[in-house]
Each structure stands twice: as structure tokens, then as C-alpha cells.
Amino acid sequence: MDTQTILNEMSLIFREVLKRENIVLDNETTAQDVEGWDSLTNMQLINKIEKKFNVRFTFRDIVKLKNVGDICHAILTELVKT
């Protein structure tokens, strides 16, 4: 799986959780760039991402995630472990 595939899947998850069809993500996208991406929705997003990609993040992993690119990298890292 590559970064673009992960990014595309994450876009679908973001649209579903935030109930907005016009969300466009790139590696530099942060919570400040997306209306409605707050701490509560962040946990919902992480939960759906973990289920979609069959990965688990520790609290420490989650705290380190600063943008969408970091999430993609974390997913790839977890996928390599399995």
C-alpha cells in the first residue's frame, strides 16, 4: 500500500466522520485546516482509521501526529510490522 492510497482512503473517512463532502486532504493538512476537526472528532477519526487499516496506535503515537502526512506515515509503519 502506498501513501496516495492511504490518503484517498483517509479522505473518505474524514468526509464520513465530519459529514462534509468537500474535504480535500494532503500530507500537510492539519486540524486547523479542516472545519470541525477537533479533539473529539480526532478520536473518532483515529478509531475509524485503525479499523480501516487494521492497525493500532498507542497514546504516544497519537500525540505525535501533527498532520495528515504523519498519520499516513504511522499507518505505513504499522502495516510494515504486521
What spans do the regions from the language model cover?
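Phosphopantetheine-dependent thiolation modules in NRPS/PKS and related acyl-activating systems
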Residues: 2-82
